[in-house]
Amino acid sequence: TVKFEGKLPKLPPLQITKSKEVCRNVPNETLIVGAGQGIRYAVVTLEGITKGVAVEKEAIHELDNLGCRFVPHVLAANVGQFVVFKNSDPILHTAHALFTSGQPQFNVGLYPGKVSRKPLVTPGVVKIICEVHPWMSAYIVVSEHPYYSVTDAYGEYLINDIPAGNYRLKVWHETLGTEE
């Protein structure tokens, strides 16, 4: 379980400046701490692993624009897999992907009801923003191996089929940073 320790910071409300008829009640998901101080949307990854189960290359992940937010807020995937960006809202959105280093990945416009499929070609943390609605963001953590998990509402995670060995556990969170 990934838990928060200390005094929980008060998150400011998101500044909804456009499309207010659709973009109501958008939560600030940059730090969600649930029951028992569990942190949601942290990505737990094994480091130093060189063998084990093969990456499922045909896997397709979905990131939806729904209620003027990206759902899910954080996802993890492998190099070689795909993300389908979907727009379930009745307004235009974009999915502009940048590595946290600032290096661009792609930028697609998503009209209502449209989808766009993009490959994940480089490992790292990718921030997704909507250029039309600047409060919208999500993250994709792209790994070269399948030994990772995104924490749930209780801060819990599960990584299956770990081969015997000694590994480091790395935890990444958009607000709290990285811990090993």
Summary of predicted features, one role per range:
Residues V2-E180:
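Extracytoplasmic copper-binding redox domains, predominantly the cupredoxin/blue-copper superfamily
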